A protein has these predicted regions:
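Conserved "landmark" site that anchors the functional core of diverse proteins
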Residues: 1-190
């Protein structure tokens, strides 16, 4: 929601729930095909712009950024946190499935997952309020070398775990593996 607030996606039915691109663990590069105002929020990651003229510079997260046609935006691997969110003024034009623009790869529900080379349409920014000057992160993201304690909330697949498995889950340290995605986090135990 912060990314949408920064770019002014709060009027004419766009709301702060306009679709954002969710970037897990960095590695995203976008090229603007037309002038656009975007914002990147979330994890503490180096975000850079390579202009169409070849100039490279770092940009702040939680702030509006004007891109010209041909500019490339890169979101690198986060130093803290794991996910970034990219909003565009006017919103990403994506047809919702069951009221959501999210892709659930496990359930195979939602719009098709993005792939390299995809072109995304941008909605109209007509009538939107001015962009925000900047936002602040809601909290400090944990760094990759920090150990954090999480609450366990059992969900609809509780029957997949016996009592011994639940006790093991709560009694040791776990590391997040690269096989994680927006549907779930794969853990490696001791």
């Amino acid at each position: 929601r912060a990314a949408n607030r920064v770019v002014g996606n709060v009027a004419q039915g766009l709301g702060v729930d306009s679709a954002c691109l969710e970037v897990a663990y960095g590695g995203l590069t976008l090229e603007a095909l037309q002038p656009a105002v975007i914002a990147v929020t979330g994890a503490d990651a180096l975000v850079e712009v390579l202009t169409a003229q070849g100039r490279r510079y770092a940009v702040n997260t939680y702030a509006p950024l004007a891109l010209d046609a041909g500019d490339r935006l890169s979101v690198n691997t986060p130093q803290a946190g794991s996910r970034n969110y990219v909003a565009v003024r006017g919103g990403w034009s994506v047809a919702p499935v069951l009221g959501s623009a999210s892709t659930d790869t496990l359930a195979r529900v939602g719009p098709a997952a993005l792939a390299a080379g995809d072109a995304l349409q941008v909605g109209s920014a007509a009538g939107l309020p001015p962009v925000a000057l900047a936002e602040q992160a809601a909290f400090a993201m944990p760094r990759a070398d920090e150990e954090i304690c999480l609450d366990v909330v059992l969900g609809p697949r509780t029957d997949w775990f016996d009592q011994q498995s639940l006790e093991l889950l709560c009694s040791q340290a776990w590391a997040v593996t690269p096989q994680s995605n927006r549907v779930g986090i794969r853990l490696q135990g001791d």
